[in-house]
Curated annotation (Swiss-Prot):
InterPro entries: KH_dom-like_a/b, KH_dom_type_2, KH_sf_prok-type, Ribosomal_S3_C_sf, Ribosomal_uS3_bac-typ, Ribosomal_uS3_C, Ribosomal_uS3_CS. Its main location: plastid. The keyword Protein biosynthesis does not apply. Belongs to the universal ribosomal protein uS3 family. Keywords: Chloroplast, Plastid, Ribonucleoprotein, Ribosomal protein, RNA-binding, rRNA-binding. This is Small ribosomal subunit protein uS3c. One of its GO terms (cellular component) is chloroplast. It is found in: Plastid, Chloroplast. GO terms for biological process: translation.
Length: 218
């Protein structure tokens, strides 16, 4: 059997960079890691709870965290302009206060910035959320996967692979279905591949969605 490795971890330092940039003493490293998890969780919860921000799905491509002694810099990469645009500064201030409250950190200031991505459907997280929304609305999984592939073609990607696992279409036995378009060279380290895993709760149970996108070769 082939051993599967996470394509992002496999390429760290080569074509993939870290989403968290900070240093810590070995004793306090785990606390820093938990702090990062709290920040990401808080941002996602805030977007989900505000219907004016999320039209069915979050639209967040990734969240980068950079820490200094006195500052935590958070950059949220979004795919769609409706997220945080209406009453922009007000929305960011609310979010900043919400995250600061959750962290309960006195020594470090928190700064949240928003960055827009030009081709949102080239991002696996946004694409996975789109497929999840289709599956929740009981659209056929094959139709949802084909539509997702059509959307990635607009983003000039070189290849995409989509995998859905679980009780697909409410069948009694769980199975795995996948589709690939173009090249997805998982064993080539210099190939820049974006990957994500997303869970979706349907009326039949939980489905797992995995997406691999071949962006470019360095």
């Amino acid at each position: 059997m082939g051993q599967k490795i996470n394509p992002l971890g496999f390429r760290l330092g080569a074509t993939q960079s870290h989403l968290s940039l900070w240093f810590a003493q070995p004793k306090s490293y785990s606390m820093g890691l938990q702090e990062d998890e709290k920040i990401r969780e808080c941002i996602k919860n805030y977007v989900q709870k505000n219907p004016r921000l999320s039209s069915g799905f979050e639209g967040i491509a990734r969240i980068e965290i950079k820490k200094r002694i006195d500052l935590i810099q958070v950059i949220i990469y979004i795919g769609f302009p409706n997220l945080f645009i209406e009453g922009r500064t007000q929305g960011i201030k609310e979010l900043q206060m919400s995250v600061q409250k959750r962290l309960n950190s006195v020594n470090q200031r928190l700064n949240i910035a928003i960055a827009r991505i030009s081709k949102p459907y080239g991002q696996p997280n946004i694409l996975a959320e789109y497929i999840a929304l289709q599956l929740k609305n009981r659209v056929s999984f094959r139709k949802a996967m084909k539509k997702a592939i059509e959307l990635t073609e607009q983003a000039d990607t070189k290849g995409i692979q989509i995998q859905i696992a679980g009780r697909i279409d409410g069948k009694e036995i769980a199975r795995v279905e996948w589709i690939r378009e173009g090249r997805v060279p998982l064993q080539t380290i210099r190939a820049k591949i974006d990957h994500c895993f997303h869970k979706v709760q349907t009326i039949y149970g939980v489905l797992g969605i995995k997406i691999w996108i071949f962006v470019d070769e360095e």
